[in-house]
Design a protein with these regions (language model features):
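N-terminal secretory signal peptides that target proteins for export/translocation
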Residues: 1-5
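Bacterial N-terminal signal peptides
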Residues: 8-20
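Non-catalytic beta-strand/loop surface segments
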Residues: 26-71, 100-183, 205, 217-270, ...
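Short beta-strands and strand-coil junctions in structured, solvent-facing domains, enriched
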Residues: 68-73, 93, 198, 283-284, ...
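Active-site recognition of the HExxH zinc-binding catalytic motif
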Residues: 77-85, 89
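A common structural junction motif
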Residues: 194-201, 293-301, 410-421
Length: 509
């Protein structure tokens, strides 16, 4: 949900700043935003949003590439996330002892891996031959490793005062970000353009092993991680939102440098990238620098939009995972994309129903009935660009079953359909929405992230401000209408984590 972006940006700011102190500055920002924000698009299609702000001589940026796990196809799931890892491995001039020799070693490594992969994927693999080829592949990998200067990209940024160097991959985007002193802007332009102009696939298979271990730790060894993955698979039977961002293990074990290069060639087109720059910069001074460095990226066609549309669901789906773990209960309801006119109403429902200790679910299930130790609502799973999921979830208290939690939760959902919310609940939602926006404007990093996200999702960064006005216009009747439309059994996917011991014959309930 779009309001989630406000909340995420708040985390990047000093939330403790008094609202009364921040509000005048925020109001001034909104009034003067268009005067201080420049949108500049290069000839190759790359768009930059530049917001000049007074204050510290620093700037923050966020680059959003319009590609995530939803753009992957079977066989290469996890490759968007994998390329994010590769983007920190340096450039032809940074992170290597001898780039030309290293490239020859990487080419030989790739050929060795593909030969090994063909052998082990044969219908009747020759075990001895497979092991011989694996040994040859590992030898090539060790040879390529001798040219690597570890952490060179990270060190180059931190050495010049950079902070917050990171990136993230979601179902629909890959985002890169950090902050630097303003007098290091040309360094930013060089590093960021260079790593996308000349991507290197340094330590690719070593990093692939890291990603596989990440999957093992976060999904395969975590019952709740497995539950959410199965939930997505059950809720989406056509749309690629069902694919995990980290990828399926069978794909991680087999995709190659060749696959990664092909993926980059299609999706890392300048027309598919937007960068927001916020802080102590002057657009007139930095645009020539942007042109000089980022203008080097060759123009490519913007990839075609995703065609697949999830068909309407006609029946409730229930999945149950049994493990030696705390029971966990999730209901997921399909909802429209974040650009739908009803999006602010979904935010209101989420706020009133399940956000925080004053929400209906928390008060009813946790405090009053003591059926759960946690109860909340969330949106935006696994993304917001396409129709996605609205979640209601609860963790049963000791001795309470998922069935008991389910019944109590559904009572609260149906109240949203059959009864008006109170004036106090609606007013609290609108007040918090404004407060979240105000706080999100205080930090350069959070604001850069919001600008680039709103611009790519809605086509206009101004939606960052107009959206709060749309939330202010939500009515009680709107909430009942949308709740009646979404909280239907046929629109529901249920995921249950049951304690295996409690289900076994003679097990305790």
């Amino acid at each position: 949900m779009l309001r989630t972006l406000y909340r995420l940006a708040v985390l990047a700011t000093t939330v403790g700043v008094g609202l009364a102190l921040v509000a005048p500055a925020a109001a001034q920002d909104m009034a003067s935003f268009e005067k201080r924000l420049t949108v500049h698009t290069l000839a190759n299609g790359y768009t930059f949003l530049i917001l000049e702000r007074d204050g510290a001589p620093t700037f923050s940026f966020a680059t959003r590439v319009d590609v995530g796990s939803a753009q992957e196809v079977p066989g290469i799931t996890g490759l968007a996330h994998m390329f994010e890892h590769m983007a920190f491995k340096g450039t032809p001039h940074l992170g290597t002892k001898d780039y030309q020799a290293e490239q020859r070693a990487i080419d030989a490594l790739e050929e060795a891996y593909r030969t090994y992969e063909r052998a082990r994927s044969a219908t009747t693999p020759d075990t001895a031959e497979v092991e011989r080829l694996r040994t040859a592949f590992k030898a090539r990998e060790a040879e390529a490793q001798t040219f690597v200067v570890p952490n060179a990209f990270d060190d180059a940024v931190s050495r010049e005062g950079g902070v917050g160097l990171n990136a993230s991959t979601s179902a629909e985007a890959t985002t890169y970000y950090y902050s630097l002193p303003s007098n290091k802007f040309e360094l930013f332009a060089y590093l960021e353009s260079e790593r996308f102009l000349h991507p290197v696939f340094r330590e690719f298979y070593k990093e692939r092993d890291v990603v596989m271990e990440e999957r093992r730790q976060r999904t395969e060894s975590q019952p709740i991680g497995r539950l959410f993955e199965r939930l997505l698979g059950a809720a989406f039977f056509a749309h690629p939102y069902k694919q995990p961002t980290v990828g399926y293990m069978s794909d991680l074990e087999r995709f190659t440098i060749t696959d990664a290069r092909a993926f980059y060639d299609v999706w890392y087109a300048p027309a598919n990238m937007v960068t927001a720059i916020v802080g102590g910069v002057k657009a007139s001074e930095i645009i020539p620098v942007i042109e000089r460095y980022f203008g080097r990226l060759p123009a490519k066609p913007k990839p075609a939009p995703l065609r697949t549309i999830e068909p309407p669901h006609i029946a409730e789906t229930v999945i149950t995972l049994r493990d030696q773990a705390q029971p966990f209960y999730i209901e997921a309801y399909h909802k429209p994309a974040a650009t739908h006119p009803d999006e602010p109403i979904y935010d209101a429902i989420a706020e009133i129903l399940g956000r925080g200790r004053t929400s209906r679910l928390y008060r009813s299930l946790v405090e009053e009935q003591k059926l759960a130790v946690q109860a909340q609502v969330g949106g935006g799973l696994p993304g917001v660009k396409y129709p996605h999921l609205f979640l209601a979830l609860a963790v049963p208290a000791r001795g309470v079953t998922n069935d008991q939690v389910r019944d109590a939760l559904r009572v609260e959902l149906q109240k949203m359909v059959g009864e008006d919310v109170t004036d106090a609940e609606l007013d609290r939602f609108k007040t918090r929405a404004k407060a979240d926006l105000i706080r999100s404007l205080t930090g350069d990093s959070g604001l850069a992230s919001q600008l680039v996200t709103y611009h790519t999702l809605t086509g206009d960064w101004r939606e960052l401000f107009t959206y709060v006005d749309r939330m202010a216009a939500v009515t009680k009747a709107d909430i009942r209408r949308v709740a009646a439309d979404v909280f239907k059994p046929s629109n529901r996917t249920v995921a249950r984590l049951e304690n295996e011991a409690a289900q076994a014959p003679g097990g305790t309930k």
